[in-house]
């Protein structure tokens, strides 16, 4: 009966079940499945005898013609640790050296503390950064090209997820530029060496950048000449490249800084637990630091510089492991950076460059105590021993006064109508009562369709979720982003928006501050902000890099506090001013507008260097509040900075009747002290 059971050549009389030999003294050796049923009666016993026995010793046998085994984590280019190498099982070589080939532990194989900026760069070994470049014998040696990584960082030609320059990019040459300070360097007109490093220029070409923008033309020589900088440039004008290009170029030319001598006792398995970055970039939101980090990876490709990013709301363990592998350029939010400093995992003693991006918000909206602690309360070099760079689209006067504490002999750079908007953006203002906003929004979306990306701004987190759900119920593919969402939810929402799977994004202004999202064709201010500077930043999400865009604002009498500034903004950008705005402005002449926060915005000369304006911030100073546009009183803080010994209170109602009234910024939920919660990060 056994002879009849044969299913697909599997028989009970198979050799693996047959007696081993005469007398049935034992069973045959086990036959692996891939050797069963071999034609011609292969000598399976010999094959089985040749098979390696189980256990770790099987992998340690001597090899002929193969490189010596060994692990060198700091040298990814070593032939015995390359993925899918030709020798070894599964294409991988041994993890354990064989007897006779075992080498003594070499601490220098993991990176020498004097040769890698922070951790890596072991005497000629790769730091495994953005492209495995090296700093060896005082020279920068770029790593080999990596086609997969190039596609990830730079995309492919005509990649829809990578925005190219628009039809109006050439108009940037007509933008007015004002640079004030002593001995301002001459601008550059092309990406050339000098002043830039050749390797950086090759990465700029990979990114398909043709010519520098106005802010880059001036910031590159200013930073390369060792000067501090306060730069104002309209949204979408290339500010990120304005500080990354000179910082990375000098890093490629000068090499890493030596780790302090006392750090040598902090090594663990050849690695230091504490990072010693040479450049620090601070920004207010998680999304913005991630965006800057992506740009840093792009331009540090194939170099020895390893960029890292840390921010709140994400797993701190993975961020610690990231900086342990090497950290030369650190992009961070202030809160998470303070946390890592307290944990003893980051030292600022080697900082050569400090960058504050969106600096006006960083200093104004509750981060000032944390920034002062980072800059003045830790081991960061003093203002005279480092370069400090501040970038933003708006720099109101009182924020300039605060910023002077962090700068030395700086150059003030004003590019374009700072605090204004690009003429590439077509601005439309519609009179819409609150109860009609949803129906008008649907009309706009049906009219414009979803061919491009549409960004809708609301004031509250609750409204962001409610409006997103409403649009989904109306069969519009929408998603939302705000401060109460987890970091993973925010990243997923942004990714779906960037890839156009959800071409409509509902966002709070704080969450989307500074984001460079390609191909946003329409920005809708569903809730108009109470601050004209916020309006500038919101609509600046479109019309970037010379591309054109549309910005629509829903206006009603509840927004009359910004009506005068809005009219001035529209006139400056040569946009149509609706008649209802003029009539409401005449009705509300008693309000006078706040001129930005407490009179700091457009009425406060947000694009002028305060050093050239004369006067002090005391009693004889020009009036800032509503006084720029009428209204009683009007002196900022009652003629003194802040109106008292405590932190300044911005406003005092419309017209800025006194600086002592009503604190601004409370609506943003930010702390007055360093330990309070913050909705910014």
Swiss-Prot record:
Boundaries of each Helicase ATP-binding domain copy? 220-413
Task: Specify the superkingdom.
Answer: Eukaryota
**Coiled coil regions, renumbered to chain:** none
Q: Which residues bind ATP?
A: 233-240
Return the motif ranges for Q motif. Answer: 189-217
Question: What reaction(s) does this enzyme catalyze?
Answer: ATP + H2O = ADP + phosphate + H(+)
For the protein in the UniProt heading, the enzyme class is hydrolase
Q: Where is the Helicase C-terminal domain?
A: 424-585
The GO biological-process annotations, alphabetized, read as: cytoplasmic translational initiation; negative regulation of cytoplasmic translational initiation in response to stress; positive regulation of formation of translation preinitiation complex; regulatory ncRNA-mediated gene silencing; spliceosomal complex disassembly
Q: Where is it mostly found?
A: cytoplasm
Q: Which InterPro entries match?
A: DEAD/DEAH_box_helicase_dom, Ded1/Dbp1_DEADc, Helicase_ATP-bd, Helicase_C-like, P-loop_NTPase, RNA-helicase_DEAD-box_CS, RNA_helicase_DEAD_Q_motif
Q: Which UniProt keywords apply?
A: ATP-binding, Cytoplasm, Helicase, Hydrolase, Initiation factor, Nucleotide-binding, Protein biosynthesis, RNA-binding
| GO cellular component annotations of the record | cytoplasmic stress granule; spliceosomal complex
The record comments on the domains as follows: The Q motif is unique to and characteristic of the DEAD box family of RNA helicases and controls ATP binding and hydrolysis.
Member of which family? Belongs to the DEAD box helicase family. DDX3/DED1 subfamily.
Its recorded name reads ATP-dependent RNA helicase ded1
Provide the species name.
Answer: Aspergillus clavatus (strain ATCC 1007 / CBS 513.65 / DSM 816 / NCTC 3887 / NRRL 1 / QM 1276 / 107)
Protein encoded by which gene: ded1
